[in-house]
Amino acid sequence: MSKSASPKEPEQLRKLFIGGLSFETTDESLRSHFEQWGTLTDCVVMRDPNTKRSRGFGFVTYATVEEVDAAMNTTPHKVDGRVVEPKRAVSREDSQRPGAHLTVKKIFVGGIKEDTEEHHLRDYFEQYGKIEVIEIMTDRGSGKKRGFAFVTFDDHDSVDKIVIQKYHTVKGHNCEVRKALPKQEMASASSSQRGRRGSGNFGGGRGDGFGGNDNFGRGGNFSGRGGFGGSCGGGGYGGSGDGYNGFGNDGSNFGGGGSYNDFGNYNNQSSNFGPMKGGNFGGRSSGPYGGGGQYFAKPQNQGGYGVSSSSSSYGSGRRF
């Protein structure tokens, strides 16, 4: 059996989201460009179901992960005269996590054990790309390790590739890996939930047409219903804009009103967003991504963040 015919690599790992498309781009012209790096098993420009007008983004699916890597290692990509932004497609489940679609070079690693050292993290994560910095967080007073770390890479695709993997094992223990948001992103998220309640800006920083009236970009507002922090609270990843400063100060503030305390429970009031089917931004069967304002999905309530699943889940029980 040829590698391209092998079913062993999940489709989600072989799929790329392509943002910033020209409204003139068709399935055929998108395919013509990206098939230079391998065999495409699927290629689609997402369109408004009523007007059939392009929504400015699409998806391509390769036969192998190796072909995806080859495409991502080639930049820039220009389709129909316009520079586009390919990123590894995010699954529906993962899209509900704050910051799931932001472009960052740093990951948060939670649930690591006290005997985990920097070289253990490096040995595992360097398979995904060049590591610039590893920070294992400790308590300022006691010096005790707090059960989480940050790893910074030289390229955002390394982070995207890591977070779409469901399981990561460091020194024999499963750990939780998520994107780490820069302070300015957290501040934008916090301010967005106080100031913007429109149809939703997907990043807001670059202005490329993403879909309908939405904007696709790298910084700022993800949704008009309250940004990352939910529609009611102080908002943002760090609660009232504290961001990751909370890690080094008093309570390990990670999410609006939540905490990650010494190998323990992660509590968060963050809202969930991004309904997708199999990473298809709503999919062809479940409706357009963002159509009718459907940026939020029902929280999953699947237990704690990392080590314990005894108390609250990642996502509060609110439905938007």
UniProtKB/Swiss-Prot annotation:
Main location: nucleus
Region (Globular A domain): 4-94
RRM domain span: 14-97, 105-184
Region listing for RNA-binding RGG-box, in residue ranges: 218-240
Phosphoserine sites (modified residues): S6, S22
Region of interest: Nuclear targeting sequence: 268-305
Pfam family of the protein (one): HnRNPA1_LC
GO biological process terms held by the UniProt record: mRNA splicing, via spliceosome; mRNA transport
Chain intervals with Gly residues compositional bias: 198-216, 276-294
Stretch list, region Disordered: 181-216, 271-320
Family annotation (InterPro entries): HnRNPA1/A2_C, hnRNPA1_RRM1, Nucleotide-bd_a/b_plait_sf, RBD_domain_sf, RRM_dom
Record's subcellular location: Nucleus; Cytoplasm
Function: Involved in the packaging of pre-mRNA into hnRNP particles, transport of poly(A) mRNA from the nucleus to the cytoplasm and may modulate splice site selection.
Protein name from the UniProt record: Heterogeneous nuclear ribonucleoprotein A1-like 2
Organism the protein comes from: Homo sapiens
Lineage: Eukaryota, Metazoa, Chordata, Craniata, Vertebrata
